[in-house]
From Swiss-Prot:
Any matching Pfam family: Glyco_hydro_18
Signal peptide positions on this chain: 1-21
Protein name: Chitinase-like protein Idgf4
Organism field: Drosophila melanogaster
Family: Belongs to the glycosyl hydrolase 18 family. IDGF subfamily.
Domain of life: Eukaryota
Record GO terms (molecular function): chitin binding; imaginal disc growth factor receptor binding
SUPFAM superfamilies: (Trans)glycosidases, Chitinase insertion domain
Length: 442
């Protein structure tokens, strides 16, 4: 019996060991292949990506998706990823020749796969054991054919639905009793899907184990862990769990109130579960080893448009917002600003005398090291040009890395390298400043 216990402990240690060497922390770096085909300054090609790899233990390339007809794992952009096109799958895994310690994983889903909310293919696949077989076989084939070291499961479960704002902020938050949106039923078959996902993880790991492939889980923003993941049942078949603990608040989820997107700790009069610490404690409290838990850090900010009724202080939560702020000049995504786009809007010699939409935002730091930074510009007399953005910068990312060390967690997942300042434009010299600061603190 003692010999069996010793063997079990050794196997568990080896499973964690393939993610990182003893005593080290994981630093998983996400690379969205779509950034390869962007235009202008937001285009991230492999030559520009390479300076980041000296800091990364893993490169997570995304994103693959599910073909709903065949239930197979497929490229979401064959002309980009496969050999008939740009062959980015092989180019990315080929980076291991230059960086032999780097593990390269393929990510599935990640909120980048098109899903019909009325017929979610990620749920229908789970509902049939026969549907899981082609997914598992195709996943193994893709990983093996293109030289990946494993698979990152960014399974696109239904998300928590925030309540509509009616009246005061306090009344708004008081209505939250559960993380999955109070009155709204996120998934009527949640228990069935939880059991089936447990089976999928077990079957995938069994298929991967002979080749030593890594299997990781990414808990996507606003997916209810208690609803969809049987932590004790899946954790031994997972090499890591990335908690994507950001985007708790976004202008798409709540267009009338601007608030911190990714606080470390609970804020007053907020849902107590919308913070990094709660999500970490949920998993470790359900028997997930701390060494398998990685905290996700977004390299971008979430931006709301402010109105004259939003006030002048910028102190969150800011009421009477008006949805997404205009898109940035590089990423061209309304309501989202990459770190270099945020940096360019903070006070600097180039914008200090500008007015209107080009005027600088007022930066407000976080001396408590608990909630994050934000910057804002109040609306003008005509009700225009008001912006509020909550964001991650190198300093706040470093604070989260310190939290990870303090809590004895596995590491950090940086999402996404293409939204970090990979050209060094903010300081004029330092490339990937968020990634570098995280690495310096781990």
């Amino acid at each position: 019996m003692k010999l069996y216990a010793l063997f079990s402990l050794l196997v568990g240690s080896l499973a964690i060991g393939q993610i990182s060497a003893a005593g080290s922390h994981h630093l998983l770096c996400y690379y969205d292949g779509n950034s390869f085909v962007r235009e202008g300054l937001s285009k991230l090609i492999l030559t520009d990506l390479e300076p980041a790899l000296q800091y990364c233990t893993h490169l997570v390339y995304g994103y693959a998706g599910i073909n709903p007809s065949s239930n197979k794992l497929v490229s979401n952009n064959e002309k980009l990823d496969l050999d008939l096109g740009s062959s980015l799958f092989r180019q990315v895994t080929g980076l291991k020749r230059k960086y032999p310690a780097l593990k390269v994983l393929l990510s599935v889903g990640g909120d980048k796969d098109t899903v019909d909310p009325e017929n979610n293919k990620y749920l229908t696949l789970l509902e049939s054991s026969n549907a899981r077989i082609p997914f598992i076989n195709s996943a193994h084939s893709l990983v093996k054919t293109y030289g990946f070291d494993g698979l990152d499961l960014g399974w696109q479960f239904p998300k928590n639905k925030p309540k509509k704002v009616h009246g005061s902020i306090g009344k708004f938050w008081k209505g939250f009793k559960k993380i999955f949106s109070g009155d709204h039923v996120v998934d009527e078959k949640a228990e069935e899907h939880k059991e089936a996902f447990t089976a999928l993880v077990r079957e995938l790991k069994n298929a991967f184990r002979p080749d030593g492939y890594i299997l990781g889980l990414s808990v996507l923003p606003n997916v209810n862990s208690s609803l969809f993941f049987d932590v004790p049942a899946i954790i031994n078949n997972l090499d890591y769990v990335n908690l994507h603990t950001y985007d708790f608040q976004t202008p798409e989820r709540n267009n009338e109130v601007a608030d911190f997107p990714a606080p470390i700790y609970e804020l007053n009069e907020r849902n107590p579960e919308f913070n990094v610490n709660y999500q970490v404690k949920y998993w470790t409290g359900n028997r997930a080893p701390a060494a398998k838990i990685n905290v996700g850090i977004a390299t971008y900010g979430r931006a709301w448009k402010l109105t004259k009724d939003s006030g002048l202080t910028g102190l969150p939560p800011v009421a009477e917002a008006d949805g997404v702020a205009p898109a940035g000049t590089q990423t061209q995504i309304p309501g989202l600003l990459s770190w270099p786009e945020v940096c360019a809007k903070l006070p600097n010699p180039a914008n200090q005398h500008l007015k209107g939409a080009d005027g600088p935002l007022r930066k407000v730091g976080d001396p408590t090291k608990r909630f994050g930074s934000y910057a804002y510009r109040s609306a003008d007399d005509s009700g225009e040009n008001g912006v509020w953005v909550g964001y991650e910068d190198p300093d706040t990312a470093a604070i989260k890395a310190e939290y990870v060390k303090r809590e004895g967690l596995g590491g950090i997942a940086v999402v996404d390298l293409s939204f970090d300042d990979f050209r060094g434009g903010c300081t004029g010299h330092d490339k990937f400043p968020i990634l570098r600061q995280v690495k310096s603190k781990l």
